[in-house]
A protein has these predicted regions:
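Central I-helix of cytochrome P450 enzymes
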Residues: 141, 194-204, 232-262
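Short, well-structured alpha-helical segments
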Residues: 117-120, 163, 223-224, 244-245, ...
Length: 262
């Protein structure tokens, strides 16, 4: 699809050839606060200038995350079933992050340096055994996958499967990643799963196994810390099993994807 500056930004097909930069440039110049009508939805606002985005992000009382953060229309039941700590405002958001921060402190990150260097060296040495190779698959994808496994504390044998499911989860509009395309097929039976995706159901099942102890997680990983420290704080439950499952899906998908392309 050719970007003629007037593409429908609610249509996934508008992004088949990449981000439609000409369309976004025109909108920034002409309609930086833009309402998009949807064929099968209630529509959404786009805030397209950097300064405006900063103001929105800093004003959670007006631009709250508590009623959802997705363009997709959700019922109350769907929202509650798929809610993560991303759909919270201060102080709840801050409280959950404060419980997680020790696992991502500078001291903890410094401890990973030698491990990262060793993993990177091994992965590159293995890749260059071939005269030609796909750098994203053999290096950029593999390193964060291995590190994600160490940080989460999941078995190394499960990593390929977890990354595949994470890709399918956030790629639910891309046939290269997902077996079910969210706006092309009936996804009703997955409406209570993360991203309305069958991969979300698979990751929920895996998270349930972590909770009941049938997946052997490392005591050095953050999942072990979460189950022992985050679910209960001062005798009060902080994170339910459902919230843990949703948070696990978030860690698998976002933790791997954002690191791979950075």
């Amino acid at each position: 699809m050719i970007d003629d500056s007037y593409l429908d930004i609610s249509d996934h097909d508008s992004f088949k050839s990449g981000v439609p930069h000409k369309t976004f440039e025109r909108l920034r110049n002409e309609e930086p606060i833009f309402w998009t009508k949807e064929k099968n939805g209630r529509g959404f606002w786009s805030i397209l200038r950097h300064g405006d985005i900063l103001k929105v992000n800093q004003n959670y009382k007006v631009f709250s995350s508590e009623r959802g953060i997705r363009i997709e229309d959700q019922t109350e039941e769907e929202y509650i079933a798929r809610r993560t700590f991303q759909e919270t405002d201060p102080p709840a958001h801050r409280n959950i992050r404060s419980l997680l921060n020790p696992a991502f402190s500078k001291q903890k990150m410094d401890e990973y340096e030698n491990l990262v260097r060793k993993l990177a060296s091994d992965i590159i040495n293995q890749a260059i055994q071939n005269t030609k190779f796909e750098a994203v698959d053999k290096i950029a994808k593999k390193l964060p996958m291995m590190m994600l496994g160490r940080i989460l504390g999941v078995p190394e044998d499960d990593l390929d499967w977890l990354v595949q499911k994470g890709d399918a989860l956030i790629g639910n509009s891309d046939p290269d990643f997902s077996e079910l395309i969210i706006d092309k097929e009936d996804s009703e039976k997955y409406r209570l799963m993360p991203f309305r995706s069958p991969a979300g159901a698979d990751l929920f099942d895996y998270a349930e196994k972590i909770i009941n102890g049938s997946v052997d997680i490392s005591k050095e990983g953050i999942l072990f810390q979460m189950l022992n420290n985050i679910k209960t704080s001062e005798g009060q439950p902080v994170m339910s099993d459902l919230e843990f499952k949703n948070f696990f899906c978030l860690l698998v998908a976002a933790g791997n994807d954002t690191t791979r392309y950075s």
